[in-house]
């Protein structure tokens, strides 16, 4: 009896599973500063294995294999699209705060220039690493095999959620009703980013939307 051949998508999902295990162990046993998580740990755990896999297993060009656009004109256009979506996210957050607390305001106090700069850099770094793994690598391959934007985006969003389970349930700042809100928001953000990436054939907008969302969340906890 012949062994069933492992498809390229199954191989990619196997790599994702290994990454999830390594990341879960890291988040459980290593309590290092956030800057180390975002600028060192995630690039090594999330991105490096993907790059090695694309080069050594798929034997493809890295940027095109991740839907990363090198065109500056397209980047500028996609930046403004992302900024618009980010503004909608901010206005939605302000509206939810007003409806709940009857006040207009989202942030306890606005950070100084250095603090804000670090928040922005961290948000961009997070957006790059998480979107490369979840959208550029996993979703792209799911979509290429199924040709169904909705089912592949939904499945990739579930995987994206599992990637956040270690931090969602380990954070002292997120609990109770807020935990549920973050879980739902993660899934919705992932669905939106996935459909945008498939429609535009570019990872730039998802990265920037993810970054804008992270900035709003970070400012909310100050």
Residue ranges and their predicted role:
Residues 1-6, 64:
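Short, Lys/Arg-rich, polar N-terminal cytosolic tail immediately upstream
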Residues 6-60, 109, 117:
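Alpha-helical transmembrane segments in multi-pass membrane proteins
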Residues 8-16, 38-43, 74, 78, ...:
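Residue-level signature of transmembrane alpha-helical entry/exit and packing/kink sites
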Residues 18-28, 87-96, 157-166, 211-220:
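Aromatic-anchored segments of alpha-helical transmembrane domains
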Residues 31-37, 62-127, 177-178:
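Juxtamembrane helix-loop-helix connectors linking adjacent transmembrane helices
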Residues 55-58, 63, 102-103, 166, ...:
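Juxtamembrane/disordered regions of integral membrane proteins
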Residues 56-67, 197, 201:
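A cytosolic-side transmembrane-helix exit/cap motif
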Residues 115-222:
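Transmembrane helix-loop-helix hairpins at the membrane interface
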């Amino acid at each position: 009896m012949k062994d069933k051949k492992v498809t390229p998508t199954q191989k990619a999902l196997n790599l994702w599973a290994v990454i999830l295990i390594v990341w879960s162990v890291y988040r459980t046993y290593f309590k290092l500063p956030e800057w180390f998580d975002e600028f060192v740990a995630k690039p090594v755990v999330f991105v490096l294995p993907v790059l090695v896999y694309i080069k050594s297993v798929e034997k493809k060009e890295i940027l095109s294999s991740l839907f990363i656009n090198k065109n500056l004109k397209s980047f500028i256009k996609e930046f403004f699209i992302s900024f618009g979506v980010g503004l909608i996210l901010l206005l939605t957050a302000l509206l939810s705060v007003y409806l709940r607390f009857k006040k207009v305001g989202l942030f306890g106090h606005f950070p100084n220039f250095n603090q804000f700069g670090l928040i922005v850099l961290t948000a961009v770094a997070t957006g790059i690493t998480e979107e490369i793994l979840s959208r550029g690598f996993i979703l792209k391959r799911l979509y290429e095999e199924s040709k169904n934007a909705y089912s592949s985006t939904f499945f990739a969003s579930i995987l994206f959620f599992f990637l956040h389970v270690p931090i969602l349930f380990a954070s002292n700042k997120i609990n109770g009703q807020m935990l549920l809100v973050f879980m739902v928001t993660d899934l919705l953000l992932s669905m939106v980013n996935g459909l945008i990436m498939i429609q535009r054939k570019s990872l730039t907008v998802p990265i920037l939307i993810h970054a804008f969302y992270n900035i709003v969340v970070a400012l909310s906890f100050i």
